[in-house]
């Protein structure tokens, strides 16, 4: 009887804990760059593109909106500046979405008012605080977490002071330790950027890129 009671209590505890957790996903044109002060784990987000939230916590995600857009008869890749989005957790599943960007007018409108929508699966709009994360220097994305930590310490609109000093990556299931120092060499900016992003990618992505590059010859 004691064993049965203990098992029942454990099951109730797990059920209670799960009831207060929601899962965040995004529209196809959004990439997660950082979650609660930590760099998003590309390997995990590549397959699930989701993370957990708790209704008792304030959460913060840094996102980038990316779209292939038309410029006359040509197409090009548009990538927004990183957007910091802060919101209160919920026990419902949540979708973070951005408007579809198809042409130059859409891009201009989004640049004039860059924002995303955070909505529960039941259709409730979740209040957010949003702001562009300003970055400086060559390859600013390489210092995203440091820049975010400084932002969170600044008391800005969407800052969360608890994330000003990033926690160790092992504390979060979707985070990973920063890679070692990345060294790039090249005769121009484009070559250096290619080297940098190649070293940031996982092995599968690197292999696909190499195959693609061979086919361009």
From Swiss-Prot:
InterPro entries assigned: UPF0319
Signal peptide start and end residues: 1-21
UniProt keyword annotations, A-Z: Signal
Pfam families linked to this entry: DUF2057
Keyword Signal listed: yes
SS bond partners: none
Taxonomic superkingdom: Bacteria
NCBIfam families tied to this protein: PRK01904.1 (NF002516)
Family (UniProt): Belongs to the UPF0319 family.
Name of the protein described by the UniProt record: UPF0319 protein HSM_0266
């Amino acid at each position: 009887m004691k064993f049965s009671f203990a098992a029942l209590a454990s099951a109730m505890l797990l059920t209670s804990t799960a009831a207060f957790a929601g899962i965040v996903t995004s529209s196809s044109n959004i990439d997660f760059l950082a979650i609660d002060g930590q760099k998003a784990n590309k390997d995990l987000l590549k397959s699930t593109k989701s993370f957990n939230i708790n209704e008792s916590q304030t959460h913060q995600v840094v996102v980038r909106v990316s779209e292939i857009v038309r410029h006359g008869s040509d197409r090009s890749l548009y990538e927004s500046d990183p957007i910091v989005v802060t919101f209160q957790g919920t026990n419902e599943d949540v979708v973070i979405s951005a408007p579809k960007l198809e042409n130059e007018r859409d891009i201009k409108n989004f640049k004039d008012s860059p924002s995303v929508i955070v909505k529960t699966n039941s259709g409730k709009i979740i209040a957010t605080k949003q702001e562009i994360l300003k970055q400086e220097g060559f390859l600013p994305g390489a210092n995203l977490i440091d820049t975010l930590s400084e932002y969170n310490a600044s008391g800005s609109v969407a800052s969360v002071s608890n994330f000003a000093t990033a926690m160790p990556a092992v504390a979060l299931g979707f985070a990973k330790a920063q890679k070692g120092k990345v060294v790039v060499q090249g005769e121009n900016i484009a070559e250096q950027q290619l080297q940098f992003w190649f070293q940031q990618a996982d092995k599968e992505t690197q292999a696909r890129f190499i195959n693609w590059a061979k086919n361009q010859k």
